[in-house]
Amino acid sequence: MSDRRQNRKTPDEQRKANALIINENIEAYIAICKEVGLNGDEMLILENGIAIEKAIRICCDGKYQEKREKKAREAQRADSNFNADSIGIRLVKRAGSGTNITYHAVVELTSRSRIVQILKSHWGNELNRAKIAGKRLGFSALFASNLEAIIYQRGRNAARRNGSAELFTLTQGAGIETRYKWIMEKHIGIGVLIADAKGLINGKREGKRGVDANVKLRAGTTGSPLERAMQGIEKKAFPGPLRALARRVVKANYNDAREALNVIAEASLLLKPQITNKMTMPWCMWLAARLTLKDEFANFCAYAGRRAFEVFNIAMEKIGICSFQGTIMNDDEIESIEDKAQVLMMACFGLAYEDFSLVSAMVSHPLKLRNRMKIGNFRVGEKVSTVLSPLLRFTRWAEFAQRFALQANTSREGAQISNSAVFAVERKITTDVQRVEELLNKVQAHEDEPLQTLYKKVREQISIIGRNKSEIKEFLGSSMYDLNDQEKQNPINFRSGAHPFFFEFDPDYNPIRVKRPKKPIAKRNSNISRLEEEGMDENSEIGQAKKMKPLDQLTSTSSNIPGKN
């Protein structure tokens, strides 16, 4: 047995290790919340949690701060009062008591140095080490990327620039900040690595600096950034000719290298690549779960397995989600908290590209396709309508997919033609095999005979699956279970429904797009950074909330929240 397997932690040991990190994150989150004046239930408002985590990631981004300090030096020549260390965070706060509670938006000022000081007091002084802050903030960045994938389909634009927009289901983690991308490599889709590899190939051709830099590779060696990217692609690619293609890219000429990467990406729509899936929640949700579970909290610090679903449900009972005026489609429309709860659930579990009918079969409430949702961008808006605890819960669970979906021996530009599985549940193939074959047939013949042989083998694999699509199943032998079925005694068979694609166009629903004319951009307060798009005075209020039942009447133990008066 290898040393790696011998050193593998048991589930109890892993949860205990997770709890140490999660508790440190929670304590840092509470301290920063207090620093910007958040107390009690305000810490459990989802939009506040997202804003605080974004501020932390930016404050820990050295390159961003270097650029900002450079701009600050230029600004100070024109404005001696400019403070490069100051940042503003847009937050939701409440006023009043009892049944007369209102919520309003404010921008609170703090400083990067103060946030870094708080983080060091909880995590240690070496924040630049991946082991200290990298993984913590990497999972935070992964959640933010998952959120953007659902709201904006961020991966689609990247896929379109680098080949076909139909490849967007391979772009998990496309929105992760560059600093955390390689730390989180095993959680990132193969399409993102392929886009990076193409960028490096283009950069080499154009003579850009940095493409020949020396970076760390696996097994303690060093090499170029392209070699590092291709190592990641080879590891993720379906076994067989796709991996052989990946090994040839580094030494291939420009045209052959790009062509080989296109084949790997397009074939991966059906020959599904490997990706490690985990549940990742914002720190405000972990705080909510800890308040409920108390001494039992460590037993639920899981990123996979049944307890990951349970701790998510527990957190959902206590958090608050804001409804603002203004959605992606209509500036005058009020957001739906039910829709935002669905987006939150899908972002925590990375479900943007999972079979939507499978996700629908695992939760307590009906779900909507993306184009039916009334949601904004999960930032704090101008007019707060309501703040409520969501009702959505998981009723079933499944193991996360960590292996290949298939056994190794086996004109609608931009439309979704494939799924990327998150849960290891046996299901029929949903991929449009004919469209994959059309994409692969666009490959032009070049002189490199070994490449042509590999292309032929890839097409043969695709063709075999296409001919036997009705008989072949992904994740053969795996099932989902009721949430109380801890021992997997009663597997539940899954049959894909009418809507396997979350981004499927719904012809029966045609929302009216209403956008107000853009207001002239006011001069930005020079003491507020570009962390948020708008600047304002520290004590300004934006909008007035409707009267509603307060969060502390919706939750049972809110009096235990740190900072609660």
Curated annotation (Swiss-Prot):
Q: How is it modified after translation?
A: Late in virus-infected cells, may be cleaved from a 56-kDa protein to a 53-kDa protein by a cellular caspase. This cleavage might be a marker for the onset of apoptosis in infected cells or have a specific function in virus host interaction.
May I ask which residue range the UniProt record assigns to the signal sequence?
none
Which InterPro entries does the protein's record reference?
A: Flu_NP
Q: Where in the cell is it found?
A: Virion; Host nucleus
Q: Which GO terms describe its cellular component?
A: helical viral capsid; host cell; host cell nucleus; ribonucleoprotein complex; viral nucleocapsid
Q: Does the keyword Ribonucleoprotein apply?
A: yes
Entry keyword Ribonucleoprotein: yes
Q: Name the HAMAP family for this protein.
A: INFV_NCAP
Q: What is this protein called?
A: Nucleoprotein
Species source reads Influenza C virus (strain C/Ann Arbor/1/1950)
Q: What is the lineage of its organism?
A: Viruses, Riboviria, Orthornavirae, Negarnaviricota, Polyploviricotina
